[in-house]
Amino acid sequence: RISGGISSRKSKRKSGGEAELVSGPFPVRGGSFKIWEGGPMDAYLLLENGAEFHGCFIGPERELISEIVFNTSMSGYLELVTDPSYTGQAVVLSYPLIGNYGVCREDMESERPLLSALLVRELSELESNWHSEGNLRDFLIRYDIPGISGLDTRAVIKQLREHGTMNGLISGRHYEGEEREALLRRIRDYRVRDAVRRAGRKEISEFPPSG
């Protein structure tokens, strides 16, 4: 929902307070974020122009700022999630149901996903595919990629089409007042950094020809 449509359901969080706001989509493991227990937990996407959308977390539940982009593919979500060109970006998928055929390592475009988050309308809890090796939710958790399900992705994409690529905050909190304005300034100032270094190979790999 756009700002104003906030769920009344209470979020369940681990005792110890709210997550830290990290400076970008690549927090240091074990130190700069907290995982909340219980679920599904409320999640919010706050765009730099002030538009806000509500859903529920899938994968790790934490707070981050990222560049927000969209993709209109009807299939191939695992190829998209592992496409290194999305390094440091949160990707909104326009197709309404994601995850229904599971995940398979053979479909991966790189060794691991490098996008900062995955944002979908509905995540399928069941996968039906003889080729599947697991479900998308577990895949995101394994690789520490947060996401949101239940978003009005058409409305988000409409914002991006009208205003161009924008930054956004993914959070388990709804911010208001001065705190919100300070966050919006921080969101607008965010830039993706070190994308080439993160996506590039650290060592030479050889792919022997076959067939």
Predicted segments — roles?
Residues S32, P40:
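Cysteine-centered metal-binding/redox modules
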Residues M41-G211:
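RNA-binding accessory domains that recognize and position tRNA/RNA substrates
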